């Protein structure tokens, strides 16, 4: 069965900063998480097992409790339609899996991650003070954080939607998780994660904060969130975490072997391109910009190793196809503003 690398929320560069600057306890916790993240990034888990095509329009959720262990999926504590068990992490995971499902169904008529009604499983309380959340190709997994650097990872709707979007990308574009195609993979998860949050809050592009993981940073950490889509590189400036290193323009592109070729770093460039397009097009982000990016994600001619220019070209073409050339020009200008030039002969 075909398999994909596992994608996690907290990038290695943040964990490295904690290891360098934290207390003994913080360093140990971050080291354990980093070792696990590194094993995840080279691990390949199989896709979910085949399932019956389920009725559209209704999520099929199951939430499990790992009870601070690392065995998956853990103890089933809430199935679809069951009431709360009083555990806030269980309730948040259950709710946000549902919100994400509803967004993709109501906006894009997509029946779960595989478009066939894939059941959505989540495991909470994974590991001891585990500083991450991840999609392993089959389910969502949430750590509790330590409460001093990171809060529980179920607290942020956009982070939940970010990880679930990796499942959609696996089923559609299958973007290789390395260098620019990997940064696009990460960016798509930020794009749709942000849109799910905006949709849930009823926000326009002007009202949105365009932050990823704003709720994750614990009190005392000097920052707004994990990433800023509007101004990459400005999300945090903290004694422990350092300064947000994301680039916002191709002239700042980071060439590195770390983090699968900088997938969490260089995603800032396409993130800002989407933000600029969404702001210029106005209204709700999912009405035009989001529709264009979704069409591109589902375009079978998009190569798995697409770089920024190839992806940009596809968004411009889909903007013209679904809307008009005025919209396409706005999308093209958004890419050019971040230094991604699309040669005219390819348009």
From Swiss-Prot:
GO molecular function, one term: metal ion binding
Biological processes, Gene Ontology terms: proteolysis
Cofactor binding description: Binds 1 Ca(2+) ion per subunit.
Chief location bin: secreted
Signal peptide: 1-20
EC number: 3.4.24.-
Active site: 163, 264 (proton donor)
Region (Disordered): 43-68
UniProtKB keywords: Calcium, Hydrolase, Metal-binding, Metalloprotease, Protease, Secreted, Signal, Zinc, Zymogen
GO cellular component entries: extracellular region
Chain sites annotated for binding Zn(2+): 162, 166, 186
Location within or outside the cell: Secreted
UniProt cofactor(s): Ca(2+); Zn(2+)
Class of this enzyme: hydrolase
Family note: Belongs to the peptidase M4 family.
Protein name, UniProt field: Extracellular metalloprotease
The organism of origin for this protein: Pectobacterium carotovorum subsp. carotovorum
UniProt lineage: Bacteria, Pseudomonadati, Pseudomonadota, Gammaproteobacteria, Enterobacterales
């Amino acid at each position: 069965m075909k398999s994909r690398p596992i994608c996690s929320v907290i990038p290695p560069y943040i964990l490295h900063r904690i290891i360098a600057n934290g207390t003994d306890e913080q360093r140990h916790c971050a080291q354990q998480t980093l070792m696990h993240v590194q094993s995840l990034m080279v691990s390949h888990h199989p896709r979910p097992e085949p399932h019956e095509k389920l009725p559209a329009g209704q999520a099929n959720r199951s939430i499990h409790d790992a009870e601070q262990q690392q065995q998956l999926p853990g103890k089933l504590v809430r199935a679809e339609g069951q009431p709360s068990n009083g555990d806030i992490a269980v309730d948040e995971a259950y709710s946000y899996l549902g919100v994400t499902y509803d967004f993709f169904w109501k906006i894009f008529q997509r029946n779960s991650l595989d478009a066939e009604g894939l059941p959505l499983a989540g495991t909470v309380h994974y590991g001891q003070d585990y500083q991450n959340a991840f999609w392993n190709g089959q389910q969502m997994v949430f750590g509790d954080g330590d409460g001093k650097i990171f809060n529980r990872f179920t607290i942020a709707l956009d982070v939940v939607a970010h990880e679930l979007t990796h499942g959609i990308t696996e089923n559609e574009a299958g973007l290789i998780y390395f260098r620019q195609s990997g940064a696009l993979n990460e960016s798509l998860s930020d794009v749709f994660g942000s849109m799910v949050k905006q949709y849930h809050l009823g926000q326009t592009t002007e009202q949105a904060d365009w932050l990823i993981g704003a709720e994750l940073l614990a009190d005392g950490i000097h920052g707004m969130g994990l990433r800023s889509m509007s101004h990459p590189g400005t999300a945090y400036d903290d004694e422990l975490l350092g300064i947000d290193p994301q680039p916002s323009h191709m002239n700042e592109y980071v060439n590195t072997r770390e983090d699968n070729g900088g997938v969490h770093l260089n995603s800032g460039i396409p993130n800002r391109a989407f933000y600029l397009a969404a702001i210029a097009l106005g209204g709700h982000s999912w009405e035009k910009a989001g529709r264009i990016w979704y069409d591109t994600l589902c375009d079978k001619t998009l190569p798995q190793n697409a770089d920024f220019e190839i992806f940009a070209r596809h968004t411009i073409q889909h903007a013209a196809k679904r809307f008009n050339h005025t919209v396409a020009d706005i999308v093209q200008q958004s890419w050019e503003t971040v230094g991604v030039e699309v040669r005219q002969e390819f348009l």
